[in-house]
Amino acid sequence: MSLISRLKAVVAGDDYLDDDFDELDYASEDELNGVNDYKENRKNSNALSNSNPFDFMNNNRSSNVVGMPGISNSSSEVSLMEPRSFDEMPQAIQALRERKTVILNLTMMDPDQAQRAVDFVAGGTYAIDGHQERVGESIFLFAPSCVNVTSSFPEEVSPSNISSKKTSPYSLETNTTPEPAWGESKLSAFS
């Protein structure tokens, strides 16, 4: 088309040419919208880059975090108990359930009740997958499963730990060394 025919068409209002211009207008508007979207995305990304990236991650995850009741991450507690009767043993079990380490000093108890108390607390410790350790004479450590107990002390030497070679009277071996008399009294040797 020539320039004159185009001018006539514009002045006369030819529909054919108007459609062409409309398409061109829409294309230019789409291009402008794409540029505006790019500018908005650029502003949003700058806002995210200026903020702390850990805050962004924490905001998404904080809604899914649920605390466990009875468990504190701050510090561990140790409960030292010197019970005088078996009636005080449920307190030790409750402390273990609260994830506290319990040290029982049973020197003040009757030996039969002390044995019963150790059995009771050891059963409770086993039920919660805990650990138990004998620390000293009538002193015991009971710990929940969240506490690791390591012992660097060698095993105590006691009469039950000593093994002696027992020979049967029908044995063919001849033993020329006498058996040690560790458990015998010196007075009984002279009489």
Swiss-Prot record:
Residues 153-191 are annotated as: Disordered. Pfam families: SepF (PF04472). Disulfide bonds: none annotated. InterPro entries: Cell_div_SepF, Cell_div_SepF/SepF-rel, SepF-like_sf. One of its GO terms (cellular component) is cytoplasm. Keywords: Cell cycle, Cell division, Cytoplasm, Septation. Its main location: cytoplasm. Residues 153-178 have a biased composition (Polar residues). One of its GO terms (biological process) is FtsZ-dependent cytokinesis. It is found in: Cytoplasm. Belongs to the SepF family. Cell division protein that is part of the divisome complex and is recruited early to the Z-ring. Probably stimulates Z-ring formation, perhaps through the cross-linking of FtsZ protofilaments. Its function overlaps with FtsA. Homodimer. Interacts with FtsZ. This is Cell division protein SepF. It comes from Prochlorococcus marinus (strain MIT 9515). The gene is sepF.
